Structures are given as C-alpha cells and as structure tokens.
Amino acid sequence: MSKMRVYEYAKKQNVPSKDVIHKLKEMNIEVNNHMAMLEADVVEKLDHQYRPNTGKKEEKKAEKKTEKPKRPTPAKAADFADEEIFDDSKEAAKMKPAKKKGAPKGKETKKTEAQQQEKKLLQAAKKKGKGPAKGKKQAAPAAKQAPQPAKKEKELPKKITFEGSLTVAELAKKLGREPSEIIKKLFMLGVMATINQDLDKDAIELICSDYGVEVEEKVTIDETNFEAIEIVDAPEDLVERPPVVTIMGHVDHGKTTLLDAIRHSKVTEQEAGGITQHIGAYQVTVNDKKITFLDTPGHEAFTTMRARGAQVTDIVILVVAADDGVMPQTVEAINHAKAANVPIIVAINKIDKPEANPDRVMQELMEYNLVPEEWGGDTIFCKLSAKTKEGLDHLLEMILLVSEMEELKANPNRRAVGTVIEAKLDKGRGPVATLLIQAGTLRVGDPIVVGTTYGRVRAMVNDSGRRVKEATPSMPVEITGLHEVPQAGDRFMVFEDEKKARQIAEARAQRQLQEQRSVKTRVSLDDLFEQIKQGEMKELNLIVKADVQGSVEALVAALQKIDVEGVRVKIIHAAVGAITESDISLATASNAIVIGFNVRPDANAKRAAESEKVDIRLHRIIYNVIEEIEAAMKGMLDPEYEEKVIGQAEVRQTFKVSKVGTIAGCYVTDGKITRDSKVRLIRQGIVVYEGEIDSLKRYKAIAPNGARV
C-alpha cells in the first residue's frame, strides 16, 4: 500500500478530512492539517478503523429498505399513473400542506419517498403518452444506484524526467494526478497557472518535491556539432597515450632529415628535391614507449588545422641550424606554437659543422622568451646532429619527459574521435584520408563522419603500410571508404550506424553552407568597438609587418602603449618583409588584424585575405597607425576610403634622360594603367615610391591609357 495524504484518504472513505484527523488523534498519531502525508502502516490502521462503520451503515440501509411499504405491482402502478395524470395539480396542492404539519420525521421521510416514486411514474407515463399495452408487463422501476466508490489514485512515480519545460497537463500526466490538483498546488505556492501553461524548472521541482518525487532534467546534445561535445571520462578509464609531436623550423634547417634519422628510413630521398611535399604522420618506439611525429611543410598546415579548431599537437620541436641561427620562419614557428599554447623543445641541429655556434642560437632565442634551463629558464634545448645521429637519444628522452609532465591520457574504450592530417583522391581507392585518433578506438567497419562527409571504414593502413583492424589513441592511420575527400584539420567521430552518420554529415554540410552565406565574423577595425562594447573582445591580436627592423620595433612599442579600458593589445607576430599568405593564415587562426607599414601584400596574400575576410591596414606614418587603432578601440573611427587597384605593370628597363629624369619602360601584367592614375613603385614587397604619372606613352605617341596586351 502506498503513501497517501489525509485529504486523499478522506476522499477515498467518503468522509470529511476532520473526521480522519480526529480518528488519527484517537490513535495518538499527530497530524498538522489535511495536507499531511500518511505512511502505509498508518493507512492500514485507518482502514481497520473504518471497516466496521461501513458494515453498520450497510446493515442500516438494508433495514430501511425492508421497512418501506410494498411498491405496487407493475399493472397497478400503470393504472395508478393513468388515473392520476389529470389530477397532477390537485396532488401537488395536497402535498404542500403535508409539509407544514408537524408530523413525525420518520413518517415524513416515508411520504416524501412515496411522492418522489409517484412523480417518476407520472413522468414515465407522460413520455409514453399511454399506459402499458394490455397483456404486456411493465418493467419494474430501477432500484436506486449505490454511491460509486472513490476513484483510486495512481501510485506516484519515484522519478520523472523532462526536457526544457512541461505544461501543467504534461506534469499532471507524468505524476498520475489531475491537472486541477496541480493548479491548486501552484496557487498555494503563489503561482497562477492554466492547464496549458509552461512551467519552468523551479516550479516543476517545487511540485515534485511536494509529492516526494525525484526530478531529472534531460540536456539536449547537438550531435551535429560534435567538435564542441566534451566527453568527460572517468579517471579509472584513462590510460597513458603516446605524445603527438610536430617538427617546425626554417627551410633547410633539417626538419625531415631529423625525422628520418629518428625513423631510420630514407624519407628525404623519396621527396621531390628533398623538400617535404605533404603531411606525413609516423610512429616510432623509444624505450618501449611510442611517439607520434607529424612532419609538416613548415608551419602552414599546423596553422590551418588550428584555424579549423583542431588542436592535435602536444609538443613542438623547433629545429634551428647551429650555423644559420634564428631566421624569419623560425620566428613565425615560435609565434604559431605560442599562439597554440604548446610546449616547445628547441633542437639545435648541424652541430657537426665547423662553423656551428650553438651558444649564439641560444642567445638569439632568448629574445623570444625561450630561455635554456641551464641559463635559469624553462625551455629544453637539445644539441644534436641529424646527419651523424649525435644527441638524438637525448632529444627522444626529453620528449618522453615532457610527455610525462603533461600527463597525456585518453580513454580507448569508447567511440573514436580525432582529426584529419591529410586527405587525397586516389584513382584506384577513391577518397583516402590520414586520420589521427585522439580518443577511443577506430575499427574496420565503423560508420564515421569526417567534416561534412561520411562513410564506413573499409580498410586501415598504418604508417608502415601494413593493414590493421583497429587504431588506438595517438595512432595515425590511412582509411578508405569515405564518400568525399575531407579537408586537412577536419574533425571525425564514429556513430552507431551509417544512417545516422549520413544524417549528421548532411546537417553539417547544410550548416556550413549557411555559415558561408552569413555575415563575416572576423574582427576588423570597423566593427572592433561594437565587439568591445558587447564584451566579445578582451584582447586585440595584431600582426605587424614593416620594411625595416627599426620600424617594426618602433611600431610594436607604440602599439603596446595604447591603453583602452578592458582591452589589451597583443602582438602575436612582428617581422620585416611583405605581407605573405603565411601572415594571413596566422591571422585567420588567431582572429587578428594585419598591419603593414611601408609594405604591401603579395597577390596570394590578397586573395587569401579576401577569402578569409582578414582585415589588412596599410600605412606609411607610424602616428597614423596608432591613431587609427586607438580610435577604433574607442569607437571613433573615421569612414574608410577604399583603394581600388586597376592594374599592375612590371618595369622591364629604365632610361635616363637629362632634364626629364628616369623613364621606366613597363609591361602591363594585369588590368590597365591610366594617365591620371596614382602609382606605387614596389620592390621586393617594399614601397620605394608613391606618386602620380607625369606622362604615359606607347612608342612615341601619347597614350590615354595602357592596357594588357
């Protein structure tokens, strides 16, 4: 027997709540009011109290029924009805004074019952219009229906679940109670609600706690955005996984040679011209522990993957040649690694060369906050030679040490998730993708969603070219079975069946299309103040490029002095030279603005900036740069005058003429040149001259414009 409230029990026994409370007090059970909850044993005791009374009542009713005068037979009743149809008003008149007389109560009740019976018979006769046909027996009038027992309430559930909100009707259904009862409870709590009104979480919890029912809210997970889903594994399910290492550095400083020396294979000889052409992922075993290496072409692929939200690298090995020192791409690699917040191990390569000077390299790297441990810093430096394999063991030991310090762990006993390292279309096998498993275990036959495409893993090949049936965390494998070629940096996830994988992939493709059509989200000086005002911006990331090192230093120092409340200027990269595609790639990944001082973006950089909606600001006066950034941060930016490039020409030859000066013989490579055009003379990405054209001639004739032939 379940628990009941006092009023519910009273309703069940068809007695007032006060009567039940009185009975409980007689039983020495204290209750405060009709809302008090009765335990199952108390309900049972009350049942015993009420059973005898019920029996007596039934006996009394039976006695009363026997004492009543005999009802007339059906035939007599019909005759009686026929005779009295016309004397209805007289009978009514006779009945009135009967009430006034002080007759005894018992007789009065008998009379009223007889009168009610007569009325019923008269009404039945009137409906028929005539008395019953001769020879046919009239059915005896139905006996009074006994009062129906109280409706038994459903047992309360132990727990209910809901998603978002519930209406009063829905909550009542879940609790097995009438909506009116829920509305009454809400009213008692000071909440006015109708049957179709939505209830918030607090109201649902209050009602359920009053009934003693547990509440659980379901959280809807958008599986299409599985990159954002963070599955928290139990600590006992986590096991140690191999570290994922990326080797970065300047051209010809020995990145691939170093990896080749570690793997004991001839990767460099297979590459065209000894330069890495694609991203390769390899796994090596050191002291019974595995290390996964990603061999990237410079740092572009690293940044591309990071721009897509794929943080795959655990440790960055920065390769610097001992005879060459810190170069522009070395600085870029440092900035990329720092922006990704990845620990750096510096590998000073080529120490076997006579002109090698490792101490100079260490001194140069201190300018970029990479201080060696032996000099009191926290950066690990390894001196080695990839050619002679000197110092390799020390480097590998340091990788394992950093890995141990980082406590890299993953759960292999779940559906696999990870990142695409590279992808291509093979003529024989179709779309092929190199995947890096970051958690879970990938098996042959698993339904998989990769980026906006899907498929079923048909075959898996490891870095040695051998077929494998499953891949564990930090293991790179090449898979086939996808419907389309994904992009490098795309995330993948395994689902329960191919049908669901297809639905998720289609939804992701649709969402990507909508995002491409939507308004740009990249930060620009025009909408900077709006983003600051809305609290979206806490840091303003800038990439600074200038014509000379002195200008770079002066510009960086001036920009860092800008003080606007709530926003900090952060220089993520500053270098000498033209604005390149690599700068745009870094700006895309870091949501930064590119500032060019006396330099211009090359053609590829322009195209990339337009495609990725990166804001490039070009200036020739430092004061103007500072003023523009400060004004943008304070929301006082002047309207921008857009510069339209109508053509480009290449200087093929120069002629010096006295009294005139230098004449440039040009070949139009793009668009056209007009006589009233303003021109810039750019040499190796640096603006040498800016002004107007004095004269424009084709052969000896004065030409209004010069177009591409």
Curated annotation (Swiss-Prot):
- The record's region (G5) falls at 385-387
The residue ranges flagged as biased composition, category Low complexity, are: 138-149
Q: Which SUPFAM superfamilies match?
A: Initiation factor IF2/eIF5b, domain 3, P-loop containing nucleoside triphosphate hydrolases, Translation proteins
Outline the segment boundaries, as ranges, of region: G4. Answer: 349-352
Compositional bias (Basic residues) = 125-137
Annotated tr-type G domain residues: 240-409
GO MF, one term, reads: GTP binding
According to the UniProt record, where is the region G1? 249-256
What biological function has been recorded for the protein in this entry? Answer: One of the essential components for the initiation of protein synthesis. Protects formylmethionyl-tRNA from spontaneous hydrolysis and promotes its binding to the 30S ribosomal subunits. Also involved in the hydrolysis of GTP during the formation of the 70S ribosomal complex.
Q: List the NCBIfam families.
A: IF-2 (TIGR00487), small_GTP (TIGR00231)
Q: What is this protein called?
A: Translation initiation factor IF-2
